[in-house]
Amino acid sequence: MDLQTKLEQLFQQNNDTIKKVKSLDELNQIRVQLLGKKGPITGVLRGMKDLSAEERPKVGAFANKIRDDLSAVIEARKAQLEQAVINAKLASETVDVTLPGDPVEAGTPHIITQIMDDLEGFFMGMGYQVLTGPEVEEDHYNFEMMNIPKDHPARDMQETFYITNELLMRSQTSPMQARTMEKHDFTKGPLKMISPGVVYRRDDDDATHSHQFHQMEGLVIDKHITMADLKGTLLAMCQHVFGKDRTIRLRPSYFPFTEPSVEVDVSCFRCGGKGCPVCKYTGWIEVLGAGMVHPNVLQAANIDADVYGGFAFGLGPDRFAMLKYGIDDIRSFYTDDLRFLTQFSQEG
């Protein structure tokens, strides 16, 4: 049997075998056996030394063709087997797109943030600026410009976290009002602002007190400002937060930075003023302090107190949230208990 005939038979025998191979490993073994250095085609090429000079090129070319044809068959089968592996994997990992997905919990603003955002939006609608200031504040702005000099007995009303003799953790957001009054150009219009933020006092933490809490103070300065302007503003704000049927009353009080000063009560939104545990059976709930800006505060900011006047108020968003949602422990706001916090999630 001549070499060409052997090569043809080799191709026919292995062509069928290759097409029936079931795995890539088995196919690789056949590749090595047929096309490797010890394979039959290599053996045929080595035997060409016994051929005549005329036969040698023909047989060599035919042997190379058979090797290329077998390589092509092997590559074709390899592609089929690889595709079969992919198809099997896809079949085993099929995703049913009609199945409901696992819900992803979305974040939501904290209840205090919601209250503050709501109040800020209300006052911005009335033309107020929202201005924030540093939490590490100068004694000068925190106390002295608020008519509370170093020897003033009112400093005993709130213990303060001092960093140095002149630097402290602000105990109120009023310092931003002082900073703004110093710079405001009243020839361009009145000053209307709120200053929300975190304040610090050396209180023992309990159900109604915290060493760190939120405050929002408001200030209006212009010519011809009266107590009626203050009352109308606070009535609109209380009706916005606690319900349109609410009324308010003003009781005389004392704050160093306002004169006259008042405590503001809102009619109880739980009992409608009839008396209940929330309002301690009085029909009224204390919600904030306010008053007309003290002339000394205006003068400290180089504002002519004979020409300009104004009103100021301060409220606690934490207290507003407690009252509005019936929460009896301020510490609940500062825990990571999702059972509590998710009750106030905003939808949409």
UniProtKB/Swiss-Prot annotation:
Keywords: Aminoacyl-tRNA synthetase, ATP-binding, Cytoplasm, Ligase, Magnesium, Metal-binding, Nucleotide-binding, Protein biosynthesis. It comes from the Bacteria. Its EC number is 6.1.1.20. GO terms for molecular function: ATP binding; catalytic activity, acting on a protein; magnesium ion binding; phenylalanine-tRNA ligase activity; transferase activity; tRNA binding. GO terms for biological process: phenylalanyl-tRNA aminoacylation. PROSITE patterns: AA_TRNA_LIGASE_II. Tetramer of two alpha and two beta subunits. NCBIfam families: pheS (TIGR00468). This is Phenylalanine--tRNA ligase alpha subunit. The lineage of its organism: Bacteria, Bacillati, Bacillota, Bacilli, Lactobacillales.
